[in-house]
Amino acid sequence: MPALPVIDIRSNHVEDSLPEQIIKGLTSQPKTLPPLLFYSNEGLEHWNHHSRQPDFYPRRQEIEILKQGGNDIARSIAPSSVILDLGSANLEKVGYLLEALEAQEKDVLYFALDISAPQLATTLKEIPSSNFRHVRFAGLHGTFEDGLRWINETPEIRDLPHCVLLLGLTIGNFSRQNAAAFLQNIANHALTGASKNKSSILLSLDSCKVPTKVTRAYTSDGVVPFALQALTYAKALLCDRIDNGIDEKVLSCNLRPEHWHYLSEWNFALGRHEASLIPRFGDVCLGSMLQDIVVKKDEKVRFACSYKYDAKERQKLFLDSGVDQGMVWTNEGCDVAIYELKLA
């Protein structure tokens, strides 16, 4: 079976800016690490293992919704649509939707977007494209912003109906204010144009605010190596700068995974889960390559948040984003739901 096409739509190489993002985050208060640092190829392997654990309810619930409601969700997507998947790390979940579209004989174009070229190649290789006649597939190598620019500006694409998939609770990784801005940006790029009345966003949100359930989900097997792998990746990126001649001399970089441990917390005030790295033994000097930054004992270096949305917060998110809620798909007892959104 021939390899599916991949289009490189990158406006710049993210790897080139990550070292600057690392330094900026570590010199801020509170200290942070950029989320993209955690999604190297090795990091994604650890995350995929973690997300399959029994206690990690978000993935399981989302799969159940797509498996049971796939036909209804597929009916909401217009014929001739361009489907832009902004979270295509693996196709196990969205596969149910694609199979439903094929069964309904809807001619659509599915584009899997990923910032990692190897991960994108793996994703596309897993697609049994020979089983599909109506759904056609391709990959897009780039960031969210690259994907939105592409769907808005590509002549043969921009006037077709668009369906943007934002599954995997991706919107929960943003602060509430930034989530509204990001969702509005998607709407402005993908829900405008000649077919705006036929275009939509399919968004998943989690409403669970039970601290024990949430923290148990984010401490299940696989999450610790996922978190610590980012330190190895960060050091590799920083050392590459030296090899490329950006620095004139070899500098020290103290990012040893064994000196850190993973911390999982529920923030009651903000309604979010927080994931951080914290020194294991005492103060850690990160070395001259990182401006001799010192992380104090018990000081948190936050790298991820997962916001949960109750009904009031969800309503405000959609209002601030300039979108209207259409259909909603969930199952009894589920905290996760998938929302159809249209331009207001």
Curated annotation (Swiss-Prot):
Q: Which GO terms describe its biological process?
A: indole alkaloid biosynthetic process; methylation
Enzyme class, spelled out: transferase
Which ranges form a coiled coil?
none
Q: Name one GO molecular function term.
A: methyltransferase activity
EC assignment: 2.1.1.261
Tell me the disulfide pairings in this chain.
none
Pfam families, sorted: Methyltransf_33 (PF10017)
InterPro entries from the xrefs? Answer: EgtD_Methyltrsf_superfamily, MeTrfase_dom, MeTrfase_EgtD-like, SAM-dependent_MTases_sf, SAM_MeTrfase_EasF-type_put
**What chemistry does it catalyse, as a reaction equation?**
4-(3-methylbut-2-enyl)-L-tryptophan + S-adenosyl-L-methionine = 4-(3-methylbut-2-enyl)-L-abrine + S-adenosyl-L-homocysteine + H(+)
Q: Which UniProt keywords apply?
A: Alkaloid metabolism, Methyltransferase, S-adenosyl-L-methionine, Transferase
The record describes its quaternary structure and partners as: Homodimer.
Reported function:
4-dimethylallyltryptophan N-methyltransferase; part of the gene cluster that mediates the biosynthesis of fungal ergot alkaloid. DmaW catalyzes the first step of ergot alkaloid biosynthesis by condensing dimethylallyl diphosphate (DMAP) and tryptophan to form 4-dimethylallyl-L-tryptophan. The second step is catalyzed by the methyltransferase easF that methylates 4-dimethylallyl-L-tryptophan in the presence of S-adenosyl-L-methionine, resulting in the formation of 4-dimethylallyl-L-abrine.
What is the similarity comment for this entry?
Belongs to the methyltransferase superfamily.
Q: What is this protein called?
A: 4-dimethylallyltryptophan N-methyltransferase easF
Species the sequence originates in: Claviceps purpurea (Ergot fungus)
